[in-house]
Amino acid sequence: AALDKGYHLVLEKPISPLLDECLALQKKAHEANRVVVVCHVLRYTKFYGTLYELLRGGAIGRIESLDAVENVAYWHYAHSYVRGNWHKTADSSPMILAKSCHDMDIIRWLMGVPCESVSSYGSLDWFRAENAPDGSADRCLSGCACKEGCPYDAEKIYIFNDKSGIRSGNDEWPCSVLVNKPTEEKLYDALRTGPYGRCVYRCDNDVVDHQVVSMRFAGGATATFTMSAFTAKCYRSIKVMGTMGEIEGDMDANVLYLRKFGQPEQVLDLGTIPDRFAGHGGGDALMMDYVCELIAAGGAEGLTSVDASAESHVM
């Protein structure tokens, strides 16, 4: 309807959990001659942008294999995919689409050629009722005898955690998902009565807590992707192996390591990300700047146009 009225679109990912709808929107965008940009924001970051330029410039020769890991972090997974908005596939989408379509998009972009085959394994192994420890309760603040030793305890995550807790000065995400304008008092009220105070072993979640994807691309290059809830830190890491060298990267540190065979390692420190650019390694703000410039210039093809994003959704 928006395209019919002549609007340009900026779409949150995924485009749709249904392939037919993704392809229909792609077709409609062409018919309407409108800009449709999907929020695959990682393409706009300095980290992945620099990596892309190195690969396209032949820094490590021909790409033969790529390994990418999304370290979700135990507390982030518990917040979003056990207690939170994306805990049920039927109400949102599968984990690989809800969380990791960013990664599928980046892998396809970096490889530079179409993906020809995909296989995947994953399951929900840990956040299940049978794994609830003896003495646990339905809610973390309802007399749970296991609170002290449980890293998934809601009070730890939203009150005390040095990254996510309000006592560390964080009054934004994830605390702001529980209540508007978070305070410690308001958060405790939400934990006593709302979904984010539930025991992680007694929720109605059904999305996988770990998954591995193997891909084969045109020309024979291969890639693997691992998504895991069971990590201490929340960040992405990557290693690309080519015929003349390798590149390894840590997005949290914003550093790339270029190792050309037979030569000294080059450390590419991409610098500290300013607060304004903090979301997704700077990608959120940079994408919106890019979209405004794209529309002002009358362009139809962007880094994450619907055409560029459709194939990664198919993957």
What are these regions (language model features)?
Residues 207-315:
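C-terminal helical cap and adjacent loop that interface with cofactors, partners, or active-site loops
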Residues 21-26, 35-36, 43-45, 49-50, ...:
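Catalytic cores of eukaryotic secretory-pathway lumenal/extracellular enzymes that build
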Residues 42-198:
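Predominantly a Rossmann-like dinucleotide-binding segment in NAD(P)-dependent oxidoreductases
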Residues 6, 82-91, 268-273:
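Short glycine/proline- and charge-enriched loop/turn segments
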